[in-house]
């Protein structure tokens, strides 16, 4: 006769309880992560707009005018060329990361083009230009005033 008292293990109920806890934790993590990612992208775009505002102010101090702009769709290209010219002898006001650019366009954290207008049409904290991202949904119905838009006049 052999005795079974020396064997140890988990009961079926203990295993099911652990699996249940793991499923609950996984469900919580999967619902929280997308919100954290969007918040991180919003903060990254706000930081980029802040860096651009500093560079624009430095440009203004040197030239006594804000960078020129074309149409709403080309304004950001003019801004990029003014702040980070391709001419190596010209003064650069900002350095961009590769993922912040697509050609001469400056991108937000969602890969959408930023918008720059001079003169600005909003009551801007900077006074003379509008700078904004269309935000997570990628659309701006009222010139940068959508609820999720990130701009320089309401920060």
PLM regions and their residue ranges:
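N-terminal single-pass transmembrane signal-anchor helix
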Residues: 2, 6-36
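Short, glycine/small-hydrophobic-rich surface segments
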Residues: 56-104, 123
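Generic leucine side-chain signal with a strong bias for well-ordered alpha-helical environments
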Residues: 12-16, 49-52, 83
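Short, surface-exposed interaction loops/tails
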Residues: 3, 38, 42-43, 50-61, ...
């Amino acid at each position: 006769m052999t005795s079974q008292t020396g064997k140890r293990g988990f009961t079926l109920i203990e295993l099911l309880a652990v699996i249940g806890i793991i499923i609950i934790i996984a469900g919580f993590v999967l619902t929280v992560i997308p919100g954290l990612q969007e918040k991180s992208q919003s903060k990254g775009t706000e930081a980029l707009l802040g860096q651009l505002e500093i560079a624009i102010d430095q440009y203004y101090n040197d030239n006594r005018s804000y960078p020129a702009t074309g149409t709403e769709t080309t304004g950001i290209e003019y801004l990029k060329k003014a702040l980070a010219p391709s001419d190596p002898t010209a003064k650069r006001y900002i350095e961009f990361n590769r993922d912040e650019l697509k050609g001469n366009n400056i991108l937000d954290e969602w890969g959408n083009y930023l918008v720059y207008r001079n003169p600005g049409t909003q009551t801007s904290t900077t006074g003379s230009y509008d700078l904004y991202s269309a935000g997570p949904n990628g659309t701006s119905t009222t010139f940068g005033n959508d609820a999720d838009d990130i701009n320089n006049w309401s920060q």
